[in-house]
Structure formats: structure tokens, C-alpha cells
Amino acid sequence: MARPRAATYDDQRSQILRAAADLFARRGYTAATLNEVASASGVSKATLYHYFSDKHALLEDIVSSHVARLQGIAAEAGAPPTEPPGSTHGAAEARLRRLVRRFMQAYADAQSEHRVLTEDVKFLDERARGAVLDGQRQVVAAFAQGIAACRPDLRAELHKPMAMLLFGMINWTFTWLRPDGVLTPADLGDIVVDLFFGGLPAVAATLAPAQADARPPELR
């Protein structure tokens, strides 16, 4: 189904990008055509070319914009606030928990874009792929710094591997976490952090009452 037409240049450009991301995620980058992107966006092919020179340009914008959003979240949620000297270890854990929760929500809000990033980045040319990979490294570094703040006793060479293990728990949740399911992205983010910090014994046996009561009756 074609999307409604956007009112402004930026709105229409964003509309085309979102439609292309949905299409690439559903059909695959190589199978999707610009005619299909134009149709899904509710624009003519000529209008599509006004914004993007080719399919590669669409792919590059989708993945680079998504990574830039993740970088912004990492910078905002992972940055330590102004704290007095000797601030508690618990503050560092709270920042890492906030970071994971924000990433889980970002993945849920941009499932198509995240799928395109994980599956289609290999189709970018060397320059564009390098820029995206640099952005991803910065995101991993932000997580590694968060882990180091939680465990300052860890050897420095363990910070990145620990961050990659944490990403291993969250990066593919978009493939199975249902928007109408029992767990919200924030719920699952908390479980991930509990599991990461404490292992299986640290995971709560049930959802907190407030979380459980917020679910639709049919899911209780």
C-alpha cells in the first residue's frame, strides 16, 4: 500500500527512506527495485530520483542514518552526568542499564532499518561501508566505556569483548520481540542487564506488578 504524500521536502525524503527500508527488509536489497520504492512511497520515479541518485544511495542513507541515531543515543544515555567525586558504582550500572534500554527501544522503533543494517551493509561500496563500520565501532566503544565504569578492575583488553557479548544479547531481538507481546523493549533491556551483571540467578522470576498490570488483559 502506498504511503500518504508528505507535505515538505524533508518529510517526503524521510517517507521515501522509511518505505525503502521496509521494502529492503521485507524483500532484500538486491531483489527490491526503485519502481517498488517509488510505489511504496507514493511518489513518481522521477520524484524519487530528485532525492536519491540510485538504489545504493538509498541504502547508504538508511544505514548511515540509523547508525548516527544509535551514536546519538550512546552519547546521550551513556555519558556520565555531573557527579561528585567518588560517585557510586551503582550510578555507572544505572547508566549502562539506561543505555541498553534505549537501544532496545531504538531497535523496536526501527526494525526495518536495523534489519537492513545487519543484513545489507555488505552491499555498500568500500567508502560507505567503512564510514558505517566506523560509526558502529564508536557505538561499541561507548558500551565498552560503560562496562569499564561498572567494573574498573577489569583488564582493559576485556572491555571490548564484554561489550560485544552484551551486543550479542540485544542485536537480534528485533527479529522475535513482538510489539504486542508480554515483554516491552524496556522489560527485555532490564532482563539483559540483570543477566549480564549477575548471570541467570540475577534475573527476576516475574515481571514487577506495575509492569504486569500494564499489559493488555489477554496477555496477563
Language-model-detected regions and their locations in the chain:
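N-terminal intrinsically disordered/low-complexity leader segments
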Residues: 1-11, 18, 81-84, 204-220
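Key DNA-contact positions within bacterial/archaeal DNA-binding proteins
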Residues: 46
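Amphipathic alpha-helical segments used for helix-helix packing
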Residues: 107-127, 175
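Basic, helix-initiating cap at the start of DNA-binding domains
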Residues: 1-27, 31-43, 56-60, 65, ...
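Hydrophobic alpha-helical connector segments
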Residues: 61, 75-109, 163-166
